[in-house]
């Protein structure tokens, strides 16, 4: 049965939701480390997710921070058994969107407060930084925070978001080849291209087979709290708002690059059809939903 898998940081759960929204069940409980990104290995019947880790202590006037290095990646089987840690807690700082190239047996993810784009083998080995946007106290500048990621496996290119401060209109979407140029490092690549800047607060990405990049934005309206798309190949196009009115849009998933499922921190999953222009709420699971994926369980 095809279901949507969605992470809930408030309830510390992974929900499995029927495609028609008629049912929702708990697939994994006790997700105490603030889960965020999720990807499904259909062939091997595994589910991977990132954890942001424990949030920093203290009082917050806005959203909590995660400057402590305690991020991790976990994996579980489709039946909810054999849960184990793939990338140990503290290997990186804050796990955000997660994707994969299963043909190359690689996981890719963003480390927000760690200011980097990372990848590793499916078993957690061979961790390497592909992009590093800052170091030390530069993490206090949210313009350096990497969040969403997509991989073009054919062209060997990574796309990622740097969201900027909340509602500040300083977000960016960038891309670079997977392979770091000879003689360069992840922190001085010299081949990074900024596709769009001055975005409200871009979050998760999906690269469609037709050459369009689709992304969520949790920033201020009217351009924020939206789903957007723009062509990135063979040439760069203009960004277009496809759907509005979210309560901080986060996750995005699709099976056909036409119908998209979108989660938000308000607890809603909406389904939008880009060809027909339809847009409706599928289900509301209560705050706070993050990453979203599709699985044949």
For the regions a protein language model found, what residue spans apply to each?
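An edge-strand/N-cap motif at the start of beta-rich repeat modules
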Residues: 1-26
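Beta-rich, blade/repeat-based domains predominating
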Residues: 2, 31-45, 89-105, 135-156, ...
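Short loop/turn segments immediately following the C-termini of beta-strands
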Residues: 9-10, 52-54, 112, 122, ...
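A short loop-to-beta-strand structural motif that recurs across blades of beta-propeller domains
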Residues: 13-15, 62-65, 71-74, 116-119, ...
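A short beta-strand motif characteristic of beta-propeller blades
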Residues: 23-29, 82-89, 126-140, 190-196, ...
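Short, conserved, GDST-rich strand-edge loop motifs in beta-rich repeat architectures
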Residues: 50-68, 158-172, 217-221
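Short loop/turn segments immediately following beta-strands, especially the blade-tip
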Residues: 120-122, 176-185, 230-234, 273-275
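Blade-level signature of beta-propeller repeat domains, shared across WD40, Kelch, NHL, RCC1
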Residues: 263-297
């Amino acid at each position: 049965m095809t279901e949507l898998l969605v992470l809930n940081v408030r309830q510390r759960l992974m929900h499995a939701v029927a495609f028609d929204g008629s049912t929702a069940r708990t697939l994994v409980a006790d997700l105490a480390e603030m889960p965020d990104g999720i990807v499904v290995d259909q062939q091997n019947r595994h589910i991977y997710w990132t954890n942001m880790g424990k949030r920093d202590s203290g009082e917050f006037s806005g959203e909590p921070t995660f400057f402590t290095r305690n991020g991790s990646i976990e994996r579980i089987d489709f039946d909810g058994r054999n849960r184990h840690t793939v990338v140990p807690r503290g290997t990186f700082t804050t796990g955000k969107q997660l994707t994969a190239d299963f043909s190359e047996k690689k996981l890719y993810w963003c480390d927000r407060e760690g200011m980097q784009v990372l990848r590793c083998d499916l078993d957690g080995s061979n961790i390497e930084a592909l992009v590093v946007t800052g170091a030390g106290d530069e993490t206090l500048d949210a313009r350096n925070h990497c969040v969403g990621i997509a991989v073009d496996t054919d062209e060997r290119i990574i796309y990622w978001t740097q969201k900027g401060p909340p509602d500040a209109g300083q977000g960016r979407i960038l891309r670079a080849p997977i392979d770091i140029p000879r003689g360069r490092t992840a922190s001085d690549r010299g081949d990074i291209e900024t596709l769009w800047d001055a975005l409200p607060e871009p979050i998760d990405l999906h690269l469609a087979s037709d050459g369009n990049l689709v992304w969520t934005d949790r920033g201020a309206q009217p351009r924020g709290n939206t789903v957007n798309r723009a062509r990135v190949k063979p040439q760069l196009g203009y960004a277009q708002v496809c759907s509005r009115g979210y309560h901080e849009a986060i996750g995005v998933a699709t099976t056909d690059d036409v119908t998209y499922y979108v989660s938000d921190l308000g607890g809603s999953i909406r389904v939008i059809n880009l060809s027909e222009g339809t847009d409706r709420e599928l289900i509301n699971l209560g705050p706070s939903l993050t990453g979203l994926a599709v699985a044949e369980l």
